[in-house]
Amino acid sequence: MIEINRVNKIFYQGAKEINALKDINLHIAQGTIFGVIGSSGAGKSTLIRCVNMLERPTNGEVVVDGVDLTKLSSSELSKARRNIGMIFQHFNLLASRTVFDNVALPLELAGKSKHDIQKKVTELLDLVGLADKHHTYPANLSGGQKQRVAIARALSTDPKVLLCDEATSALDPATTKSILELIKDLNRKLSITILIITHEMEVVKNICHEVAIIGGGELVEKGAVSDIFAHPKTALAQEFIRATLDLSIPEDFKARLKDTYVEGSYPLIRLEFTGSTVDAPVISQISREFDIDISILSSDIDYAGGVKFGLMLAEVFGNQESTQKAIEFLRNHHVKVEVLGYVV
């Protein structure tokens, strides 16, 4: 459905050349919810704007539904964009228009009849859960309701693709969850292809089938969400995943933590479990086999793409040789172990 082939985007600030996108290649299958995640300035918003030619790539191809948008004339591009809906972080609703009239605007511009507009807008508002808000103005809506109006408007031309540029960033957690559920529901009911740009791995974890990670304008890693969470290959992917299960070191431990081993100190370790290792009784195994004690400070577990993953902070009590053997045992059983320091 969406093919991004060797796309580069260069901006100029005076004589300075800024490579916002560097040789990006992505293939997004029809009906997929595809996430692109990256930190601020990574190039992800530039990428999504290239998909509907709001930003024209410096070079490369952007193929949507079999058509290379980079080769279209202005009139051809205008027509092709009807197949691509888009929602933003800021809802861009017209304050002087009611909910109904905001959703109706693209249909009016397309020259649809009043009867067709009435029918289509009524269907869309019912679809997004705003059947009772036809005559309400944006000023009287919550943030989540405003985004629902924006989604209905984006769907008014029956697009095959929906682009979401940080669509939940301005919303509180509960509202974010409801909007993500709506997007997932629309994907299921309409078989619409959805491209989501976000800086939150929580968004990717909750609704995406596949994900690409971008850093410094480059594609760092891509794959099924379950594969990325289970076997992250890059430091950036690991960083985003860890942020979804943020286990902070307690302050009293920070004050006693040393970088190197000293007599009488014990290692503080962070364990990362993915896939089958989450259910394996490896902690009790190393305690028995290597005659060590484990003090668990904190732990958390979650799901992404049908795969369980978890983090644990623990202090290990035992002699150095036994502790090192236990750590090697964990690593050999596909548990990632990081020694954060030594507690005195």
Curated annotation (Swiss-Prot):
One of its GO terms (molecular function) is ABC-type D-methionine transporter activity. Gene3D superfamilies: 3.30.70.260, P-loop containing nucleotide triphosphate hydrolases. It is found in: Cell inner membrane. Signal peptide: none annotated. InterPro entries: AAA+_ATPase (IPR003593), ABC_MetN_proteobac (IPR012692), ABC_transporter-like_ATP-bd (IPR003439), ABC_transporter-like_CS (IPR017871), ACT-like_dom_sf (IPR045865), MetN_ABC (IPR041701), MetN_ABC_transporter-like (IPR050086), NIL_domain (IPR018449). Residues 2-241 form the ABC transporter domain. Belongs to the ABC transporter superfamily. Methionine importer (TC 3.A.1.24) family. The complex is composed of two ATP-binding proteins (MetN), two transmembrane proteins (MetI) and a solute-binding protein (MetQ). Part of the ABC transporter complex MetNIQ involved in methionine import. Responsible for energy coupling to the transport system. This is Methionine import ATP-binding protein MetN. It comes from Aliivibrio fischeri (strain ATCC 700601 / ES114) (Vibrio fischeri). The lineage of its organism: Bacteria, Pseudomonadati, Pseudomonadota, Gammaproteobacteria, Vibrionales.
